Amino acid sequence: MKALSKLKAEEGIWMTDVPVPELGHNDLLIKIRKTAICGTDVHIYNWDEWSQKTIPVPMVVGHEYVGEVVGIGQEVKGFKIGDRVSGEGHITCGHCRNCRGGRTHLCRNTIGVGVNRPGCFAEYLVIPAFNAFKIPDNISDDLASIFDPFGNAVHTALSFDLVGEDVLVSGAGPIGIMAAAVAKHVGARNVVITDVNEYRLELARKMGVTRAVNVAKENLNDVMAELGMTEGFDVGLEMSGAPPAFRTMLDTMNHGGRIAMLGIPPSDMSIDWTKVIFKGLFIKGIYGREMFETWYKMAALIQSGLDLSPIITHRFSIDDFQKGFDAMRSGQSGKVILSWD
């Protein structure tokens, strides 16, 4: 079968032929329809320091997808041939304390699809049936293919009660924009998103944020005054991993504010911890999606009218995958979809 693989320890992704993966007793065989390119895939393409430490070569990459069930392991129940599915890209052990306690997303033995085991940038994918999620008929293939990153946004945004709150989102990448859209959809008062990339800030405006602020040109305190905010933000969603953005967030949070952090800052990032302490801030780290509550909320948010369509900006055939990666690497894109049909 055709697959996009990391074949060499250098920049790039290559189209290759690999065997169709073997179906285990508890697995589903999925024929891939559409995949989306993640920032993680771009890191792997660029062969940065993280990738060099993490990715075995060769490796079929990719973990954002939608497809059709074409094979079912003999122990599997609840699925049938033809079911349209996406799936959780974190394969968990099932036997650690967190897994057994119902906190599966905190499994210490997590294996990543397209990172530690073969991924979805291929004609077929095998995953445990436990990880598959049936897609409702009224959700399109395009939207289903981005459920993985949408789940990061939903998990981050819904970490705290947002109704009537003022929310600051730092980082207008696709996940940050989707998190801002979720916050607005569920009843936040003001949702302000910050970045320095004007293309992505314009995408955020299309998604209905209260204000999209280019912090290279505008002062955030002036924006807060314009919105009538006198006490700071109630909730912060840190999606950028940029130290200056996080420091600004700490400066502008209200006392007792709550911060969810998905962005990964450099290990040597320094902050003024007195602001965390004396403001009584609560900071929560976010990794992946809650299994599977986040997935049900994703489907329900779309079914209740949340429109994510503006975030998908580019669509290519899999044979034009290089154009897709070029678009993602340019920084002038939202989500990029690759069609395998």
UniProtKB/Swiss-Prot annotation:
Cite the annotated pathway.
Answer: Amino-acid degradation; L-threonine degradation via oxydo-reductase pathway; glycine from L-threonine: step 1/2
Extract the GO molecular function terms from the UniProt entry: L-threonine 3-dehydrogenase activity; zinc ion binding
Which SMART domains does this UniProt record tie to the protein? Answer: PKS_ER
- Which reactions are catalysed by this chain? L-threonine + NAD(+) = (2S)-2-amino-3-oxobutanoate + NADH + H(+)
Site positions (Important for catalytic activity for the proton relay mechanism but does not participate directly in the coordination of zinc atom) are: D148
Enzyme category, top tier = oxidoreductase
Q: Which residues cross the membrane?
A: none
Please report the name of this protein according to its UniProt entry.
L-threonine 3-dehydrogenase
Q: Which organism is it from?
A: Escherichia coli O17:K52:H18 (strain UMN026 / ExPEC)
Instruction: Recite the lineage of the species.
Output: Bacteria, Pseudomonadati, Pseudomonadota, Gammaproteobacteria, Enterobacterales
